[in-house]
Swiss-Prot record:
PANTHER family: GLYCINE--TRNA LIGASE, CHLOROPLASTIC_MITOCHONDRIAL 2, GLYCYL-TRNA SYNTHETASE. It comes from Methylobacterium nodulans (strain LMG 21967 / CNCM I-2342 / ORS 2060). Pfam families: DALR_1 (PF05746), tRNA_synt_2f (PF02092). GO terms for cellular component: cytosol. One of its GO terms (molecular function) is glycine-tRNA ligase activity. The gene is glyS. Disulfide bonds: none annotated. This is Glycine--tRNA ligase beta subunit.
């Protein structure tokens, strides 16, 4: 079956955009084909710095014929209705329509519309220019003389040529006939910018790949990654070193080269006095190079005075000039970093605190200096809850942001916290304080490590709670996909800190403590909404671990639930209980009772929330259920008070036999009004008894 080959050849595409652009190209073209009824066997898109390419295999040469029956108005309908029908169906007169008789609706007109299938190449000639013109680049540009004309093409970088061929492997493919802003689709592409810049004629994908390889272009980004990683490891191994692997850098570098050639450079050993993270950040950020690790006798990471760079060409001198040029730049950058390091060490963190008053955190939330004071006060209050020393927690929080005004963090913001730890250690701060300065930002994401040191936990919680409470107090909350202040991440960080450390943290109390640092704002205006936000984040966190979101809703629906650790334990106990036969049957009994109550309360316009009257019990099953409810409620309440949620579930499980017997033997809607009301009150007592652990009405399934 025929294949499509499409290549869009341009100036250099930013590395960060390439993978998404390739996926967008594949999806846009294949979706457009499927919408028109053209199926295919497979599709794969590719990206290099200078081209996007798409191969779609197994397309038909022609679309299927379409036969459609379109129902029209009744025979004898008004002329306007008939004319509208003829126009929409593309008929010239009623003679072209068929009359169909229906026993119920009478006779009506039907138009039989037959459309022959279109040639695939003609459909592609419509789809491809539309996709190219409307391509969703994050940033795009116009260029040349055509850029002044309305509707001219926008592309990420100037587009030079288009390859678009279609046809079976056994025949010569045809050119897909279209042009965009004077660029005619054809069979000509170009090789590597320096190694093989001449034109290359390609007509099918099977020829396209080897032709590019001969022209020093590796089309597949994953293969470029593999080449870089394999060669870098080999170079390091040959020197007795280990490559410090970096997935993000590897992805970026693979998007910077079409013909990757790995080389090794070095720098003066004196620069190894700088913290290894600084060396890595310097070489990574400025030169897109990988650092190397030297063998260590003490188990601590020690960098080597060497680095791996990736060139986009195989130079005639073996890369000597390229290496020398990179070494000069790395030496200059590391000299700057060493200057920052030596300069920063001369100024104690404590002395830097006044400068934080000049950094605005948010126009409505004050400066970083004011924020530090709030975080320090909150950390001292939270310290007893996590087993931390209040003095150490307050001191760590006070110094936690001081490195923001250092030279090093000014140059490399991603090193905030880490540099604070280094400077704190050098200045003789206790280890717990130095560690907390680094770790108070953690966890930064779902896979990031959670701090376990008590002082670190106290400061990390204080930092995140201050952020959340502050933004809720000024009513700047995440909306849809927008979360510019990473508040979802902060809430998830609080959840992970609490659960990982078994921290008993009543959130409403923490909100009140956190908001105390904000003038003229009380927690009552936002506490419920912020608690709901935590509930949503907890659902996401537990759902990723396999928990049911409806059980979280059921527990949060009980008033006063703001202890995340106890909520999770209650959810876990509820889930285990509902997996048992007793749990499933009790849930079924609850639903039956709730449904009866809902119907009868709506019909009667009243709630049956009075206590059942034992004097009105006429059947033993009523007395048995009432007694069982009294006993189960007492045992469940006692178990919940002792935080024994499994025990509370066991207490509720004892209700199953009397509930089953009640529904088997008792007619709830008795003719006697008093008897009926009392039995409905008994069902309400069952409904309320389950609320000792959760709102069973929120449970799905």
């Amino acid at each position: 079956m025929p294949d499509l080959l499409l290549e869009l050849f341009s100036e250099e595409i930013p590395a960060r955009m390439q993978r998404r652009a390739a996926e967008d190209l594949r999806k846009l073209v294949t979706d457009a084909l499927v919408e028109r009824g053209f199926l295919y066997e497979g599709a794969k898109a590719f990206a290099t710095p200078r081209r996007l390419a798409l191969h779609i295999a197994g397309l038909p040469t022609r679309g299927k014929d379409v036969r459609e029956e379109r129902k029209g108005p009744r025979v004898g309908a008004p002329e306007a209705a008939i004319q509208g029908f003829l126009k929409s169906a593309g008929l010239t007169s009623l003679a072209d329509a068929t009359v169909v008789a229906d026993p119920k609706k009478g006779e009506f007109y039907v138009a039989v519309i037959e459309r022959p299938g279109r040639d695939t190449i003609d459909v592609l000639a419509e789809i491809l220019p539309a996709v190219i013109r409307n391509f969703p680049w994050p940033k795009s540009m116009r260029w040349g003389a055509a850029s002044t004309e309305p509707g001219s093409l926008r592309w990420v970088r100037p587009l030079h040529s288009i390859v678009a061929s279609f046809g079976p492997e056994t025949e010569t493919p045809e050119r897909v006939p279209f042009a965009i802003d004077g660029i005619e689709a054809g069979f000509t592409t170009y090789g590597h910018r320096f190694l093989a810049p001449g034109p290359i004629e390609v007509r099918r994908f099977a020829d396209y790949l080897p032709a590019l390889e001969r022209a020093r272009v590796v089309l597949d980004a994953d293969r470029r990654r593999d080449i870089i990683l394999h060669d870098a490891r080999d170079l390091a191994f040959a020197r007795g070193l280990d490559l410090v692997e970096d997935e993000g850098l590897l992805e970026e570098v693979a998007g910077l080269v079409e013909w990757p050639v790995t080389l090794m450079g070095s720098f003066d050993e004196s620069f190894l006095d700088i913290p290894p993270e600084v060396i890595r950040a310097t070489i990574r950020a400025n030169q897109k190079c990988f650092v190397l690790r030297a063998p260590s006798q003490d188990g601590r990471e020690r960098l080597a005075n060497a680095f791996i760079l990736v060139s986009n060409l195989a130079a005639s001198d073996g890369g000597a000039a390229i290496v020398a040029g990179n070494e000069r730049v790395v030496r200059a950058r590391l000299s700057d970093a060493k200057f920052f390091w030596e300069t920063d060490k001369k100024v104690p963190l404590e002395s830097r605190l006044p400068k934080l008053k000049d950094i605005v955190f948010h126009e409505k939330l004050g400066t970083q200096g004011a924020r530090v004071e709030r975080i320090a006060a909150l950390a001292r209050n939270l310290a007893p809850l996590v087993g931390a020393d209040a003095g150490l927690a307050g001191r760590a929080a006070r110094l936690a942001k001081a490195d923001l005004v250092t030279e090093m963090v000014g140059e490399f913001p991603e090193l905030q916290g880490l540099m604070g730890r280094y400077y704190a250690e050098l200045q003789g701060e206790p280890a717990a304080i130095a560690t907390a300065i680094e770790e108070h930002y953690k966890p930064l994401g779902p896979s990031d490590r959670v701090p376990t040191e008590p002082v670190s936990v106290a400061v990390a919680l204080a930092d995140k709670l201050d952020t959340l409470v502050g933004f809720w107090a000024i009513d700047e909350k995440p909306t849809g996909s927008k979360d510019p202040f990473a508040l979802r991440r902060a809430a998830l960080g609080v959840i992970r800190l609490v659960l990982a450390g078994d921290v008993r943290l009543p959130l409403l109390g923490a909100f009140a403590q956190a908001v105390a640092g904000h003038a003229a704002v009380g927690p009552e205006s936002f506490a419920a909404d912020l608690l709901g936000f935590f509930a949503d984040r907890l659902k996401v966190h537990l759902r990723d671990q396999g928990a049911r979101h409806d059980l979280i809703d059921a527990v949060f629906a009980i008033p006063g639930q703001d202890d995340l650790l106890m909520i999770v334990r209650r959810v876990e106990a509820l889930g285990r209980f509902l997996d048992t036969e007793d749990g499933r049957n009790l849930l079924a009994g609850f639903r039956r009772a709730a449904n009866i109550l809902r119907i009868e309360e709506k019909r009667d316009g009243r709630a049956y929330d009075a206590a059942p009257d034992p004097a009105l019990f006429s059947l033993p099953e009523e007395s048995a259920l009432a007694n069982a409810l009294d006993a189960a409620r007492a045992r469940a309440a006692e178990a919940v008070a002792a935080e024994d949620f499994e025990g509370a579930m066991r207490a509720l499980a004892t209700l199953r036999p009397p509930v089953d017997a009640f529904f088997d033997k008792v007619t709830v809607n008795a003719e006697d009004a008093a008897l009926r009301a009392n039995r409905l009150a008994l069902l309400n007592a069952l409904r309320e008894a389950t609320r000792a652990v959760a709102d069973f009405a929120r449970i799905e399934g």
